[in-house]
């Protein structure tokens, strides 16, 4: 799925604010942001970080400068294993017209050397927002990996793939109670993007829609 395709399908689904969260990189964010603006979507920059524990964590930033600075530190603790495109596909860097600019040689989704708490603190230092991705999924979900939802780091946000799972999960895992819940499709292919926006949020009228969403999330980042 290319940055421009993701932006275009997001517009068709009625999305007002969107972020591209590739595994452990933000290098397609400029192309995605440009495509979003062409489609009338307000963009955020993002990454789906894989922690040392193999937990996926959504990391969001207001601008590419902050995201790129964050990526630089993340990459200082990357595990360098060559990608095998025949198994994992090509990891392309593209522009907003879907033209290929380059390719990442090392496999991106691997665990980094950043532990969960360290990663949380790193995002904070770079002015971002972070929360555990797809907490109700077995693969790379925080609960599946740790066996519980921890009190530390003090996550105030949790992402679900299915909001119908919230009652059973909050009953079983007390630290999930009272958090701000977001929805994420975890779309890796075009057909996985919902036909209609599946999550809405009340935000103030100040600034751009992306700025408003970001500030709401920032206000909930700490439990």
Where would I find each of the regions flagged by the language model?
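Charged catalytic cores and adjacent phosphate/nucleic-acid-binding surfaces used
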Residues: 1-15, 26-69, 121, 126-129, ...
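Alpha-helix-centered segments that form part of catalytic cores
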Residues: 90-126
């Amino acid at each position: 799925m290319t940055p421009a395709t993701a932006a275009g399908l997001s517009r068709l689904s009625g999305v007002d604010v969107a972020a591209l969260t590739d595994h452990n990189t933000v290098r397609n964010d400029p192309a995605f942001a440009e495509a979003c603006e062409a489609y009338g979507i307000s963009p955020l920059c993002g990454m789906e970080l894989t922690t040392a524990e193999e937990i996926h964590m959504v990391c969001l930033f207001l601008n590419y400068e902050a995201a790129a600075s964050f990526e630089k530190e993340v990459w200082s603790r990357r595990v360098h294993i060559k990608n095998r495109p025949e198994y994992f596909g090509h990891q392309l860097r593209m522009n907003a017209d879907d033209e290929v600019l380059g390719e990442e040689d090392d496999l991106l989704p691997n665990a980094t050397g950043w532990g969960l708490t360290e990663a949380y603190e790193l995002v904070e230092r770079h002015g971002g927002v972070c929360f555990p991705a797809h907490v109700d999924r077995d693969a790379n979900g925080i609960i599946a990996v740790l066996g519980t939802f921890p009190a530390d780091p003090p996550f105030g946000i949790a992402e679900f793939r299915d909001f119908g799972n919230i009652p059973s999960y909050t009953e079983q895992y007390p630290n999930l109670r009272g958090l701000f819940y977001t929805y994420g499709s975890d779309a890796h292919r075009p057909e996985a993007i919902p036909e209609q926006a599946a999550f809405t949020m009340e935000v103030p009228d100040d600034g751009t829609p992306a700025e408003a969403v970001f500030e709401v999330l920032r206000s909930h980042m700490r439990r």
